[in-house]
Amino acid sequence: MDNDGGAPPPPPTLVVEEPKKAEIRGVAFKELFRFADGLDYVLMGIGSVGAFVHGCSLPLFLRFFADLVNSFGSNSNNVEKMMEEVLKYALYFLVVGAAIWASSWAEISCWMWSGERQTTKMRIKYLEAALNQDIQFFDTEVRTSDVVFAINTDAVMVQDAISEKLGNFIHYMATFVSGFIVGFTAVWQLALVTLAVVPLIAVIGGIHTTTLSKLSNKSQESLSQAGNIVEQTVVQIRVVMAFVGESRASQAYSSALKIAQKLGYKTGLAKGMGLGATYFVVFCCYALLLWYGGYLVRHHLTNGGLAIATMFAVMIGGLALGQSAPSMAAFAKAKVAAAKIFRIIDHKPTIERNSESGVELDSVTGLVELKNVDFSYPSRPDVKILNNFCLSVPAGKTIALVGSSGSGKSTVVSLIERFYDPNSGQVLLDGQDLKTLKLRWLRQQIGLVSQEPALFATSIKENILLGRPDADQVEIEEAARVANAHSFIIKLPDGFDTQVGERGLQLSGGQKQRIAIARAMLKNPAILLLDEATSALDSESEKLVQEALDRFMIGRTTLIIAHRLSTIRKADLVAVLQQGSVSEIGTHDELFSKGENGVYAKLIKMQEAAHETAMSNARKSSARPSSARNSVSSPIMTRNSSYGRSPYSRRLSDFSTSDFSLSIDASSYPNYRNEKLAFKDQANSFWRLAKMNSPEWKYALLGSVGSVICGSLSAFFAYVLSAVLSVYYNPDHEYMIKQIDKYCYLLIGLSSAALVFNTLQHSFWDIVGENLTKRVREKMLSAVLKNEMAWFDQEENESARIAARLALDANNVRSAIGDRISVIVQNTALMLVACTAGFVLQWRLALVLVAVFPVVVAATVLQKMFMTGFSGDLEAAHAKGTQLAGEAIANVRTVAAFNSEAKIVRLYTANLEPPLKRCFWKGQIAGSGYGVAQFCLYASYALGLWYASWLVKHGISDFSKTIRVFMVLMVSANGAAETLTLAPDFIKGGQAMRSVFELLDRKTEIEPDDPDTTPVPDRLRGEVELKHIDFSYPSRPDIQIFRDLSLRARAGKTLALVGPSGCGKSSVISLIQRFYEPSSGRVMIDGKDIRKYNLKAIRKHIAIVPQEPCLFGTTIYENIAYGHECATEAEIIQAATLASAHKFISALPEGYKTYVGERGVQLSGGQKQRIAIARALVRKAEIMLLDEATSALDAESERSVQEALDQACSGRTSIVVAHRLSTIRNAHVIAVIDDGKVAEQGSHSHLLKNHPDGIYARMIQLQRFTHTQVIGMTSGSSSRVKEDDA
């Protein structure tokens, strides 16, 4: 076969590839509210009224203000009447303030709660719809990280748009409209002129929004990609650490962030130019209005008060249109985010899970038939898996499927479960096509135990209950007893309530598999599908479970995928699959009797040859007859047992606090979310972030210049308008014309400055913000990857949460620090300019107005305090739901097989209830706090105007000065209020800063790259020794794994570890890789304590082949190259050839460039394992750690790969965890681990000779017994099988 199975790409970085996606178009705006119910419409109605009244209040206030100006102007000779009028209008101001108090409460509380209610329903519907999709949808369309991203980030975007931003939009549009109404009723000519320029503002706003929407869409895609890299890295953290891939993960993450960063720069420029253009048009419009207003006053068509009312109203209305732009940008983002969510919700699966159509059979006899089935996986339609496939499983009988890895055995199981429909042909149950049967009913009749025991991060009891949710405790315990799980469960501190951790990692593979079997038994199905059901069990457990399965199978139609003879010895029929069709079918005896002409017989001969070799070695030193394999029996054809046991999984060592109970205990959330951030800490964190941002000081300086000038423009603008007001009352028309012309030119100058400096402000502050975000995210990932393994074992550091934390914390920090500082600088400049002008013109009035500012500040700070308490743990509560959703999608086949969709959705719904309740109270308090602050503001206006009239009455000041001071300071007070309404962002930013620095400051228990350690020589001898090791996993110190364990692997020799499931074999491998530190004792390499070496450097001399082949979602080439980043193409092909992988890779349409899918789902288990072996071989390390390295391979591959491994391990120190004797027959030393220490140690022959009644001998006896039974079945058919081969 041609050697180039697709030209491989250049050397690897961990870039996660994915199928190209079409650009997503946003949904219609009204579609955002598709989950609103009656109460939501009521809330939105009240919220809209509140927002409308709130928005109208300012133009109404301006109308009163204009009337007051006229009172000043027309009553200058009658001070008593003037005081009376002013007092009346001051009371009107208080009424407006009270209206704002009530309306802002209604606006904020109703929109906030309605938004949370609607998005809660949307999240639930999304998960429901995602779980309702057929399996092919997850193969081709959606990754787990997409679901996590949608539920986390996209849903938050939609919520932001349909709550706060929509309230703001109605508020600003009400201001805009009411401003024009006030204008038209005051001076319609002036208002009409203004109306002529509004379309121009709208066009600019439209272009601005469209541009931001496109950029936002692209940015979200690149951030989603970055999040996927983080999630894959953390999920496979053991592989990343073992192969020293931390820097590669960081580089890949950095590359993905760079794309988002550049898009962020463009967004800043677009935002600045859009806002600048809006202000340019608005200011030019007012220049025109001032000139035209003067014309109308001179011609006695209006007076100064009405003219100024129109201008003020139009000014506020026009600015409100600009202020609505961020809301429009949020709508654009939300429409795109909603499109992604609704695409899943609206997607009709090809195979409808919840359809009520289809029949339910009265009784099931269990005849299963596949007739002329052709099938290709939707993700690879050009690769045919089944070709004119025919198979009949008689009712109540057991059929075993054997065949090479990738021959289609698991595909048959998938078709019977109706995860897929065949391309052509039929799958029948009792003569009925599966397509005509009700799907939920069909799956209720089928019990599935797959080779990958998928457990959820809940209790053992809840995991078993997935089989039948209405079962009682007695039935649960009985199922566990029959599955040989009861004995180990009751020894656990929490028994059946023990938490199994994310993906069941708290349990050994064998323990997980027994729980999966108990789950299937509880279902009591008519048809049983066993896909390598006992592959992850040690000899003793396998024998007990197999006996339980044998009892369980009686009277049920059973289809077994297996590679061990013991597993299939009692099958009524054996079907041999080859190249997508059944090449042989018959009983074991019939197939074996074909001899040389039969595929099955050849396979058994191959196995027997392996036994012969093992036995001849054993017989040289021991006359004692023994079974020749360390597993219960010999494999016939290896199938994917790849997920049978996590090679690195902790052995019942720490139990996650994750909890599927319906109540959420706030105390279980990370403390940093609940604690209030002390001001000192916050200030300290702020300065640290500022230092982190120091390379951008030039950009920050230029951005600040933009902010200062943009802020000052507002004060100048107010001054120009108040100056014109006094000019309007001047009787000298020539003077009026000259002054108005001067101020109009000044306004045109201000409009040009607004265009330039808005662009400057937003462009440069966005560069500062984007660089900070990228830097914070990179540092956070580096800090995450420096932590020791025990940190990753904690529930709050689960992969989806870390990905979300990197995304949200960095964003919140950027929001608070980058975006908001720009606004603060702008408003500070505004206040300074305004206060200076006020004090210069009339210091007494300025002093009174400035004196009431603290009241406003106090009111807003009160709101800030309440916001802290109520926003604290919302993110954590959502994180729990997000984790559950991610697990459900990752294990979607298990969820589907057990009809558990409704249960998962119920648990998810329960997780969303607490944040919903808290959001209600948060809205009440935030709304009231904001209302109080606004009321105080208007009360201060009333006080200021009353005092101004008092000053005029007593001759201390005149009308012209007081009105200028009042207007300039009124504008600055609005700026102060706007600054303080940013409090929620600073609270989020403060919490995020705490979270960021908590992560960055954490001192790892095991430093991976300590410069003070001893350098590792270029070549090691490779001697490994564990001396007097005591060990417990850090999270459960009360469960001791090892007690005074001592082991030694001599340089260049092979040490095999055997023992019952859960005895700590894989813990030895974890200690050698220094994932954990022993409680006492030492792990030595070449006679030196491993702690003295640089950890990353020593790991470069160790290669691992885990039983669970963890692959990254990239190409085959890059997965192999992950073993050695400098490997050449020739070395990669050589490693693949040695691992028996080159042939199947070359046969794929894209060869080495084939995308393997998330966690390698596009490949069979055997194929994944061979790639994992190639990855280890390309490393050329002195120490090889093989954890069931060949367990997932078929007989032919196993033999060639075992030879390759023997050859590769030659001269290298090898530590092998194995169940099969063929894997360890040549081991120099076999160590039997039991009860936390080495119970027996020596070569195979030594153990049998010196410990005839020992544990190892008993295991051999057990295998001998089962194997003899199998051989007994074949002896009638073939004289070539020797008796002593058993």
From Swiss-Prot:
Annotated spans, Interaction with FKBP42/TWD1: 1049-1286
Outcome reported for the amino acid change (mutating F65A): Reduced brassinolide-triggered ATPase activity and altered brassinosteroid exporter activity
Residue ranges crossing the lipid bilayer per the database entry: 42-62, 93-113, 166-186, 187-207, 277-297, 301-321, 705-725, 745-765, 821-843, 845-867, 932-952, 967-987
Effect noted on mutating E1188Q: In ABCB1(EQ); loss of ATPase activity associated with altered brassinosteroid export capacity
Regulation: Transport capacity is stimulated by the chaperone protein FKBP42/TWD1. Transport activity inhibited by 1-N-naphthylphthalamic acid (NPA), cyclopropyl propane dione (CPD), cyclosporin A, verapamil and quercetin. ATPase activity is specifically activated by bioactive brassinosteroids in a dose-dependent manner, including brassinolide (BL), 24-epiBL, 24-epicastasterone (24-epiCS) and castasterone-alkyne; BL binding leads to structural changes. Inhibited by vanadate.
Entry keywords, A to Z: ATP-binding, Auxin signaling pathway, Brassinosteroid signaling pathway, Cell membrane, Glycoprotein, Membrane, Nucleotide-binding, Repeat, Transmembrane, Transmembrane helix, Transport
Impact after mutating L319A: Reduced brassinolide-triggered ATPase activity
Disruption phenotype: Reduced brassinosteroid export. Lower petiole angles under red plus far-red light. The abcb1 abcb19 double mutant is severely dwarfed, with excessive leaf and petiole curling, reduced internode lengths, increased stem and silique waving and skewing, and exhibits poor flower fertility due to short stamen filaments not sufficiently elongated to position the anthers above the stigma during anthesis; this phenotype is associated with lower free auxin levels in blue light and reduced length of epidermal cells in the middle of stamen.
Example of a GO biological process term: response to brassinosteroid
Binding-site residues for ATP 1, renumbered to this chain: D139, Y377, S379, R380, G408, K409, S410, T411
Gene Ontology molecular function: any one: ATPase-coupled transmembrane transporter activity
Effect upon mutating E978A: Normal brassinolide-triggered ATPase activity
Record's subcellular location: Cell membrane
Effect of F61A: Reduced brassinolide-triggered ATPase activity and altered brassinosteroid exporter activity
Expressed in which tissues: Ubiquitous, with high levels in peduncles. Mostly localized in young developing tissues, including meristems, as well as root and shoot apices.
ABC transmembrane type-1 domain ranges (all copies): 44-333, 700-988
Composition-biased stretches (Low complexity): 616-635
Effect of L721A: Normal brassinolide-triggered ATPase activity
Xref: Gene3D superfamilies: ABC transporter type 1, transmembrane domain, P-loop containing nucleotide triphosphate hydrolases
A Gene Ontology term for the protein's cellular component: endoplasmic reticulum
Annotated family: Belongs to the ABC transporter superfamily. ABCB family. Multidrug resistance exporter (TC 3.A.1.201) subfamily.
Subunit and interaction comment: Interacts with 1-naphthylphthalamic acid (NPA) and FKBP42/TWD1.
Functional description taken from the UniProt entry: Brassinosteroid exporter that, in conjunction with ABCB19, supports the accumulation of exogenous brassinosteroids (BR) in the apoplast, thus promoting BR signaling initiation involving the specific receptor BRI1 and required for plant growth and stress responses. Auxin efflux transporter that acts as a negative regulator of light signaling to promote hypocotyl elongation. May contribute to the regulation of leaf position and morphology during PHOT1-mediated blue light responses involving auxin distribution, especially in low light fluence.
PANTHER family: ATP-BINDING CASSETTE TRANSPORTER, ATP-DEPENDENT PERMEASE MDL1, MITOCHONDRIAL
Protein name (database record): ABC transporter B family member 1
Native species: Arabidopsis thaliana
Gene this protein is translated from: ABCB1
